[in-house]
């Protein structure tokens, strides 16, 4: 069972709901160029997938797409808490940043506002106590890509055939890897691999990682929940992004995660930096 461990040493668990809750999935469309607003350097060609998986009874992931934002929120909490948290993060981020000029300050402020709103919500409704969500979002800003990150969903960048993880997991085992106490291989099977040290909404304040990376023509970006990266290695993801087009890569990533057990909800967004004269696949 999945656990979320926050900085006050409270443990919130990612439960299966006792009663199935219907959650509409984002419509799966062919990838199309999406405008990124007034600071646009080039359009992104985007496709996304989300699936409940083979074990859980409902989907607590939320795909964020709109207002120039691309992201994943992976909710946690019993009853409807996980869905409430991830959906609240999605709607809160879209509302907070609608029409705003992209900046690191605006992104950090939006995440803080969402965190406060979710925290207040569970104070008002004790049935939501312990809810929270990961949050990893991309926000194009001219020739830069802004990234906001809390938790263990991930953002990757594929450039010149090499895939690298650009966010750092806020998890117990990731901290142990960074301190040299575990190898990445050991971390992948460690019994505490599903404990995270930061989540949106579990405390009155939040410290988000805010990154700014250069955008280059032909770059590919991947944002995904742990339901994907927990079952597919970096090498798996890199191979699919290099050898197949955007749509095929998304389909194959989802298929492989399901074939390997689909233990959690699976969500991903793939985006490619458009090049002159390029059309959607």
For every predicted segment, state its role.
Residues 1-281:
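PP2C/PPM-type serine/threonine phosphatase catalytic domain
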């Amino acid at each position: 069972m999945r656990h979320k461990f926050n900085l006050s040493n409270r443990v919130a668990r990612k439960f299966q709901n006792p009663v199935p809750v219907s959650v509409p999935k984002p419509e799966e469309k062919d990838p199309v160029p999406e405008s990124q607003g007034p600071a646009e350097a080039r359009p992104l060609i985007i496709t996304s997938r989300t699936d409940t998986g083979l074990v859980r009874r409902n989907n607590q992931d939320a795909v964020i797409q709109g207002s120039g934002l691309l992201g994943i929120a992976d909710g946690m909490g019993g009853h409807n808490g996980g869905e409430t948290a991830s959906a609240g993060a999605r709607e809160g981020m879209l509302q907070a940043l609608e029409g705003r000029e992209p900046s690191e300050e605006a992104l950090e402020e939006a995440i803080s506002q969402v965190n406060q709103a979710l925290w207040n919500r569970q104070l008002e409704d004790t049935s939501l106590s312990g809810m929270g969500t990961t949050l990893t979002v991309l926000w194009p800003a001219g020739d830069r890509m802004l990234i906001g990150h809390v938790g263990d969903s991930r953002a990757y960048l594929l450039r010149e055939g090499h895939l690298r993880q650009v966010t750092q997991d806020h998890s117990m085992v990731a901290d142990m890897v960074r301190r040299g106490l575990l190898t990445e291989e050991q971390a992948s099977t460690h019994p505490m691999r599903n404990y995270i040290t930061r989540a949106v909404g579990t405390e009155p304040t939040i410290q988000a990682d805010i990154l700014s990376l250069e955008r280059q023509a032909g770059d590919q970006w991947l944002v995904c929940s742990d339901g994907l990266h927990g079952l597919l290695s970096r090498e798996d993801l890199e191979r699919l992004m290099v050898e197949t087009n955007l749509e095929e890569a998304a389909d194959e990533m989802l298929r492989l995660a399901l074939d390997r057990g689909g233990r959690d909800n699976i969500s991903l967004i793939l985006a490619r930096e458009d090049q002159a004269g390029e059309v959607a696949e």
